[in-house]
Curated annotation (Swiss-Prot):
Keywords: Endonuclease, Hydrolase, Metal-binding, Nuclease, Nucleus, tRNA processing, Zinc. It is an enzyme of class 3 (hydrolase). PANTHER family: TRNASE Z TRZ1. Its main location: nucleus. It is found in: Nucleus. It comes from the Eukaryota. It comes from Triticum aestivum (Wheat). The gene is ELAC. Zinc phosphodiesterase, which displays some tRNA 3'-processing endonuclease activity. Probably involved in tRNA maturation, by removing a 3'-trailer from precursor tRNA. One of its GO terms (molecular function) is 3'-tRNA processing endoribonuclease activity. Belongs to the RNase Z family. This is Nuclear ribonuclease Z.
Length: 176
């Protein structure tokens, strides 16, 4: 059979499902992250980071299943980003499921407000931005962060750069 065409954004493969009103989950497997969880498609379970845009069930309905399935597969607890106003409600959702099936549902919940940033890795950050929907919602932009050697230190031998760095000199600028 023919290979499925691959969708890429800025060189990152994108997978997922989006059926309006039924299910939305967009996955960036090489970054190990998903935007919204829909009904928890199997492919989403392997992603370490999850970003929830709003509380409609077609975007958040699979959340307990996502965390439970990761636990079943002995994957590390996921980091889940939610709009700040949803934090308490999402924790209550997990508490209800814990009470029903005595599972741990281990995860890290990160409430992000519009404009707030979070460091995913040394070279990757996320920032929440406002979106417009029938209920409060937000989107997330993921961007790379690099440390670039300051102009003054270009051309110096590596040993000298190392010495400066160890002595506490700021030798780099942050580039996004």
């Amino acid at each position: 059979g023919k290979a499925k065409p691959r969708l890429e954004i800025e060189g990152y493969p994108v997978e997922g499902i989006s059926i309006g009103g039924h299910e939305t989950c967009v996955i960036f497997p090489t970054l190990s992250l998903a935007f919204d969880i829909g009904r928890c498609p199997q492919r989403a379970v392997a992603q370490d980071f999850l970003f929830i845009s709003h509380a409609h069930l077609d975007h958040i309905g699979g959340l307990p299943m996502y965390v439970a399935t990761r636990g079943l597969y002995r994957l590390r607890p996921p980091t889940i980003f939610v709009p700040k106003y949803l934090r308490e409600l999402v924790e209550r959702l997990f508490d209800v499921h814990r009470a029903m099936d005595q599972s741990e549902l281990n995860h890290t919940l990160v409430p992000l407000d519009i404009g707030e940033e979070y460091e995913l890795r040394r070279d990757l950050k996320v920032r929440a931005f406002k979106t417009y929907h029938t209920i409060p919602s937000q989107g997330y932009v993921i961007y790379s962060v690099k440390q670039k050697l300051k102009q003054d230190y270009l051309g110096l031998p590596g040993s000298e750069i190392k010495r400066l760095k160890l002595s506490g000199v700021e030798i780099t600028n942050t580039v996004t």
